[in-house]
Amino acid sequence: MGKRLFWTALSGLMVSAAHAAPPAPLPAQQLDWQPWGDQAPNGALCSGRYVEPGYRLSAGDTPRQVRTDSATAAYGDGGATVLAGEVVLRRDDTQLEAPRVRVNAERDRAFAEGPTAVRYPGLLVRGGDASMALDGDAAQVDNAHYVIHEQRVRGDAIELQRLPDGRYRLDDASFTTCEPGNRLWRMVGSDVTLDRAEGFGTATHARLEMGDVPVFYWPWLRFPIDDRRQSGFLWPTLGFSGDGLDYTQPYYLNLAPNYDATLSPRWMSEHGTMLGGEFRYLFGSDQGTIEGAYLASDKGGASDNPNDPDDAFEDESRWYIDYRHAGRFSPRLDYQLAYGAASDGRYFDDFGRDFAEQDTDHLLRLARTTYRGDTWRLDARAQGYQKLDYPLDEDDKPFYRLPSLSADARWRQDSGFYQEWNSNATYFWRDLHGVDSQGRWTDEETGNRRTIPLREAANGSRLHLTPALGWRAEPSWGFLEPRAQLWQSSYQLDYGNRQTDRDENPSLVAPVLSMDSGLIFERDTSLFGSDWRQTLEPRLYYAYVPERDQSDFPDFDTSERAVSWGQLWSPYRFTGADRLGDVNKLSYGASTRFLEDDTGRERLSLSVGQSSYFSDRNIDMNGDPDTLPNKERNYQDWYNATRDRSPVITQLDWRISERWRSRYAWFYDADRSVTEKASAYLQYNDPAGHVLNLGYSWQLEGFEPADDAEDRLGYNREDYDVSFAYQATPSLDLIGRFLYDNTNDRAMEQLAGVQFNDCCSAVQLVWREWIEDNDTANTIDDDYTDRGVFLRFVFKGLGGVGQEADTYFEEAIPGYRATRF
């Protein structure tokens, strides 16, 4: 897609209806506005607040009773009563203030000479001449200024009427949440009706003005005046990019308190007209959403990807659907449904509405129910997902689990003994319709013939059982845990038309034995003028798993685990259940921690550990126990399988102060005297909203570059990552990120943004440039640079323009907490 710009329709119709001059502004104090002065709370964006004063007269003893207070009272013509001199008239919860008030002879209407003030609960109206019914709710104020205190809404009108049904009608009126004296924005309409009981307003010939400049016009508009949901048009989004003009006009439907919908027609000059929508619902403990979009015939668009033709999808329909539901049958039994699908792997690249959506790489399909008891946990699911690669290679198609049934339990005795039952039965399936009987298929990008390995060619069922027995003693000075587990896997496989002599019913039974132990030593010490409690925690771990032939086993969900601190203390070399790696190792290490003596808070932890192997690791992804990786063709895999010791792993986590924290990791191969992997991170996090992250990572043979496929051992991966968020003022935030791949001399991501947030409005402007890799090939020569600009306007109390992307910014900048408008 690329270079997509979301912004408000500031270039909308510059239409302004003829209208009378608005009333002259009033001083802020006459609108119940009180400045904060020295009492402003932290982070206050407004210079003050509206404070509603109490009534000057108490209510009458009976409904509709009228009470008055004035300097003088006299009879006028025709039996009318004339009150003068700071007149206050109250009937029920309505109070009228004026210098002179005339009550007609029928005593059912009062007429006041300006300046006047009419108060209702939560509402103040000031203006010129006014009249009000004494036997009903109707009232009228000329040249009115009004304030709705709780919603921080104010405005003016040539004439304001309170109708008998309690609604308010305003002629040539305005509406804003900006504080008095601030004319940043206001909504203006020739005929405005406010319904406080329902929480919305309507306006004809409405226009949005910024300053005194009209920037958008609506013949008719419905808008909220509080936080309640209302049906009506939402703010449009208008974008310009390499794909041309992109306009979306959403319409919100508040169908019921527990379900609603949004329709979003979208017109794109280079693609055509798309209809999108979303439906949300909540019924008791069940809730869900369904959203989607459909484009009947794509005009072709324009792609920033040099590997894709611009007309790749010309005349084709483009669509997506995403359904999510979560519910609960009982406190222990819940369920979840999800179904996502898109017409093609580039849908979100072309039509993603924000940065996060453009990065969507898969869509989940799931039906699951789970029971969580005190002992047993039962789970039944059917699960898969659509992988959004374009084109999608045959060997990258994911397996579906149709179904997957799990039953797990744990029993624990006071003596420290425990028993576990872990079981899973799953049927794995995927459609390899483009593969011939030899397992070969044609790569759409290169035209080359490729072959799917036999271990990935079968569909079938797997029964996996791992019961375990253990004992754990955990006194205050350490722990000891011997554990024995039985690993059992059996398969029923179907290779379809693939020619093979592999066993279609392979099985495996093997023990997994381990012994974990540790000691905890403590001492009191003093450093840097402070008292500390230091611990020394040596740990010793032994694991044994015999080798078993798994050369006929499939690969449904398995990958080799990366070396890590946690991996030192685990008997498993693979994820999933299709491979059980042989291991005979002893892991040893120690940790020391420094804790504040008075609070017990950990300020520093340092850990060092390593594993020693007593035999080679013969089982790899091929599963053959009789062969090792070829030393000449794949030296690194051979070395990892035959090395006597793991790298020495060092980890440091140092909370330098309340605001500064650092983390460091180092993987050092003492046999070759080389660093295999290293990373360092430094973070500053100020409660005032300032965040700084500095990161560095280096990895030997992190991946294989496209232009240097032969030089595997000498290839390294080096990255720099800098990100920040700076709150310059309570109203102004700056954010940024720079992720740099030093190996290939390219920026992986650049992000720069500014956010302005004041009393009545907010603006987010973010620019992003990133490397797009839309397939799973482990190369870089097909990557390309994409970029986008995100612009969001929020008119507080009225609505906003642009998609919310705060979640993405928080992920890109660890520690950053975006302001929610």
Curated annotation (Swiss-Prot):
UniProt superkingdom: Bacteria
Signal peptide bounds: 1-20
Keywords: Cell outer membrane, Membrane, Signal
Localization of this protein: Cell outer membrane
Coiled-coil segments on the chain, per record: none
Main location: membrane
GO biological process, one term: lipopolysaccharide transport
GO CC terms: cell outer membrane; transporter complex
UniProt similarity note: Belongs to the LptD family.
Subunit structure as annotated in this protein's UniProt entry: Component of the lipopolysaccharide transport and assembly complex. Interacts with LptE and LptA.
Protein name: LPS-assembly protein LptD
Species in which this protein is naturally found: Chromohalobacter salexigens (strain ATCC BAA-138 / DSM 3043 / CIP 106854 / NCIMB 13768 / 1H11)
Gene name per UniProt: lptD
